[in-house]
């Protein structure tokens, strides 16, 4: 005998069981309007809805409100340890407001616009982007589409979109100041790709910090990506470039620093006895490599949270308190840096 499906629980059923009006239940279960409901009534309605197994009709809600309570997130490389905590922050902020997060990993920048067009077709309410290059046409594409959007971890240098970022220049100043305090004078930089704002900002931070200390301009090798392999290649180029070997190397991120470790070990050079190394990001496990990496710690989860909160403010028609939110980095000193050996 075929089992009969139980009748679908409606918003009217929740209202009757809660002893409140249907409109009260509607507001209580709408993330955009629930702030108008008292805490006691909100808890009562939510508990009743859970007990009865009520599932809101998202399609009907979207038709009524013009919102799907879904946001999109574009990431360049989900395997990069920087991005999972950023995504966690975005998801936490979204969950607190009853939003669903639609994530796309965009490994190839050429795919960004087609993916974004697909998200727009799904009627997302807004977008958090961590993928934009410098002078990226994607930013104009987003703006022309009329979509609410916020950048995270990378800022648009022209200010076309709001952003939540860390202070890349300050981060590099902290690393350089630490090395100079140890006695280093010949400091090199394995720079991030100059096609992305973070690569440019960190390079400028190193250059300015050395000028502030009245030290020679750094020897710079640009990495073609933020990867361990790129760090290996850049470190080889630096060692083969001739002249006096640098006493210390400021790396644009931790993966690049680990690539530098590989090449220095293969060359028979010791860290930090022969050369000091600093990273950037404080990704998981860099405190367990040999030697543990001195690096810059960033509030990645908070970056994600802030970006999402800025997006929700825009979606709800609120004025942003700032077009760019800048969070402060922190130096974490470990065993990969020490005073230089006597010349």
Regions found by a protein language model. Give the residues of each.
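Active-site-adjacent beta->alpha loops and helix N-cap segments on the catalytic face
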Residues: 134-143
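Amphipathic helical "hinge" segments at domain boundaries
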Residues: 39-43, 51-126, 204-207, 223
